[in-house]
Structure formats: structure tokens, C-alpha cells
Amino acid sequence: MLRQLNLTREISRWIFMPWQRGAAGTASAEPPALPINDVIVDYDGPDLPLPEYPQRPNEPLEIRKQRLVYQSRKRGMLENDLLLSTFAAKYLKNFNEEQTAIYDQLINGVSNDWDIYYWATDVKTTPAEYNTEIMQLLKEHVKNTERVQRFRQPDLT
């Protein structure tokens, strides 16, 4: 992190403060040489390891449900925030321990939130490992047969 900060500072000086490029006010035409170790490459590759979601085997059921309510509301994309928060508000309180564990695996085991959205809306086929009773319940919830307006997340109770 510190190396990245130093690299950013050096690049900013070279671009935005040309009077500080050289020593004692002399401007050099070349940017400062950067060590190859400071270059950060960020890319999507098939060989990148995905982080594993930590299992919480001894977590009490009520604490787990509270965590899942929070995680359903804070997905990082509005579509899933609305779908999952309304789903959790409607169904999560009545889930038993097994159903809660399945829902936990569904929203935290998938590495890409767009996959959850596409599976729930039947745009893509749901893989067998996630095609559970909870996913079927989520798909029914997404169909919104009651025509409930979902413009905002439900209030916390």
C-alpha cells in the first residue's frame, strides 16, 4: 500500500507539478524511473484464485440472520440490494437453520453478484449447486406476482 502511495505521488508530481521535476528548478524531459516492483497490474485472469468465504459453523442462528439481513442490503449493486433486501425482509425471519445456511451459501458463495441477479431473473441457467429451494423461492419473489413496488429497501425492524 505504501509503495502504491509513493508511486502515485511521484506520478502526480511529474504530471501536475512540472516545476518540481528536476533539482533546483531545472525541469527534466523524462519522467522519474520507476522500479518494476512498484507497478501494480490488476486484471481478470482465469488463474487468479478467488477468495473463499469463511464458514462460521458456531454462529448462533439469530446472529447469522442479522448478518444476512445486512449482507442482503449491502451488495454493491442496486438491483441485488432491492431484490435480496426485500426477499430477506419477507422470508428470512421464518427460515430454519438449514434454509438459513443455504441462503448464506447463495449470497456469499458466489463470487459475482451479477450471477445471482441473472439466475434469479432466469436470464441464465442456475448451476445445480445453487438451484435449491431457496433459489426457487427467490425466483418466485423476483416475479413479483403481488405487484409490490420495490423502489427502496424495506425498513429495518
Swiss-Prot record:
GO terms for cellular component: mitochondrial matrix; mitochondrion. It comes from the Eukaryota. Its main location: mitochondrion. The keyword Mitochondrion applies. SUPFAM superfamilies: YgfY-like. InterPro entries: SDH (IPR005631), SDH_sf (IPR036714), SDHAF2 (IPR028882). One of its GO terms (biological process) is protein-FAD linkage. Keywords: Chaperone, Mitochondrion. It is found in: Mitochondrion matrix. Interacts with the flavoprotein subunit within the SDH catalytic dimer. This protein may be expected to contain an N-terminal transit peptide but none has been predicted. Plays an essential role in the assembly of succinate dehydrogenase (SDH), an enzyme complex (also referred to as respiratory complex II) that is a component of both the tricarboxylic acid (TCA) cycle and the mitochondrial electron transport chain, and which couples the oxidation of succinate to fumarate with the reduction of ubiquinone (coenzyme Q) to ubiquinol. Required for flavinylation (covalent attachment of FAD) of the flavoprotein subunit of the SDH catalytic dimer. This is Succinate dehydrogenase assembly factor 2-A, mitochondrial. It comes from Drosophila willistoni (Fruit fly).
